[in-house]
């Protein structure tokens, strides 16, 4: 599979309106994923501003594999100075520019500057294609890095593009399918994991027990929204390749861990973004899934004071299982201020024994997100 295949797939994905998104079976999962990205961006901005001399600091951002520009509003809220948006899918990139232009027209005091670059970041030198040549403070790559792991050269080229123009002390952040979790899920289900909203099938059953570091193809479908071959990006390998590029790990958190980490400070935004489904449903609303998808939420509500008509935020079991298949990460380029230097703690992938790792995966498989 080539980058052209990925571009053709995402170019063909229909742009959905607000009404269509609200009716989606994965409405809450989508919102929760968006909230996760918002919190990740917020944490990176806090680290950048903590070390900045000028507390009115406005970062220069590279949005790598920006798609249709779904994070443009997040960058507006983040008060960025400028942004370069790059993607291999030309139709998606055009839609991102249209979205930016519409936002700019509505802004009374102007919007951040933006450049849109059509590039195959697995092959091209992105820096040479930019009209502007900024040193970026922040590079963001959301749900896309793993496509480059089709082979070693593509992965190395993509990561070089992600880090080459990042200033010392700047951050690379992103979201990524959790290769360890995916391999566990397909092994436990004879090569294919499937529930009401997603399916994951590993391409070559014969190599499931020992997938290759590059070119480990799997097929992921989420509510019929994504059905393009993807590739496992084993996080310790990602970390190793980035360390060769003078990057150091700040944190890696699997989505359930990240949700727990941000849930308290980000509770208001989580509620406004409707990232969790109210249970029991309010005002005669219907649940987004069958009642048996909320067994853990039902049992948890029973432990609360019934006189107060308690309600919690949760996800259906199927959405939660899909949510658990991702992780977030942040790397920092060496040099610059040490104010945001990473902790010396190892990631769970580095420190867990096989027994501990298996127990954690089993616990997450049955866990429900509640607040």
Residue ranges and their predicted role:
Residues 2-55:
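Class I SAM-dependent methyltransferase Rossmann-like catalytic core
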Residues 56-67, 84:
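Conserved class I S-adenosyl-L-methionine
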Residues 70-124:
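Class I SAM-dependent methyltransferase SAM/SAH-binding core
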Residues 127-139:
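A short acidic, Gly/Pro-enriched loop at the edge of an enzyme's catalytic core
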Residues 136-154:
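A short SAM/SAH-binding and catalytic strip from SAM-dependent methyltransferases
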Residues 154-168:
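A short glycine-rich, Lys/Arg-flanked "PGG" loop and its adjoining helix->strand segment in the class I
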Residues 168-177:
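Conserved beta-strand signature within the Rossmann-like core of class I S-adenosyl-L-methionine
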Residues 187, 193-196, 205-371:
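C-terminal lobe and adjacent flexible extensions of AdoMet/dcAdoMet transferase-like proteins
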């Amino acid at each position: 599979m080539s980058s052209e295949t990925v571009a053709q797939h995402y170019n063909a994905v229909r742009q959905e309106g607000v009404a269509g998104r609200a009716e989606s079976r994965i409405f809450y999962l989508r919102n929760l994923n968006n909230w996760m990205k918002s919190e990740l961006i917020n944490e990176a901005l806090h680290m950048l501003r903590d070390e900045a001399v000028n507390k009115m600091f406005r970062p220069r951002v590279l949005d790598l594999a920006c798609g249709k520009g779904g994070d443009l509003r997040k960058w507006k809220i983040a008060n960025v100075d400028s942004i370069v948006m790059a993607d291999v899918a030309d139709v998606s990139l055009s839609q991102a520019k249209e979205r930016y232009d519409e936002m700019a027209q509505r802004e009374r005091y102007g919007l951040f500057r933006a450049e849109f670059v059509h590039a195959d970041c697995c092959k091209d030198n992105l820096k040479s294609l930019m009209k502007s040549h900024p040193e970026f403070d922040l590079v963001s790559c959301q749900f896309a890095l793993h496509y480059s792991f089709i082979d070693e050269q593509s992965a190395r080229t993509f990561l070089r593009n992600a880090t080459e123009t990042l200033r010392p002390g700047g951050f690379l952040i992103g979201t990524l399918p959790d290769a360890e979790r995916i391999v566990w899920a397909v092994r436990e289900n004879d090569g294919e994991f499937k529930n009401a909203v997603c399916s994951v099938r590993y391409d070559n059953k014969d190599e499931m027990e020992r997938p290759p570091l590059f070119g480990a193809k799997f097929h992921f479908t989420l509510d019929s929204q994504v059905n393009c071959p993807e590739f496992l990006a084993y996080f310790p390998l990602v970390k190793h390749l980035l360390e060769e590029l003078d990057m150091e790990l700040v944190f890696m958190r699997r989505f359930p861990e990240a949700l727990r980490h941000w849930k308290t400070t980000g509770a208001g935004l989580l509620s406004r973004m409707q990232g969790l489904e109210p249970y029991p449903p309010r005002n005669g609303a219907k649940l987004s899934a069958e009642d048996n998808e909320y067994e853990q939420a039902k049992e948890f509500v029973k432990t609360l004071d019934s006189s107060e008509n308690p309600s919690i935020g949760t996800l259906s079991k199927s959405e939660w299982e899909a949510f658990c298949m991702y992780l977030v990460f942040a790397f920092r380029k060496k040099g610059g201020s040490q104010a945001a230097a990473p902790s010396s703690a190892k990631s769970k992938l580095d420190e867990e024994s096989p027994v501990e790792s298996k127990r954690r995966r089993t616990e997450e498989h049955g866990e429900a997100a509640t607040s």
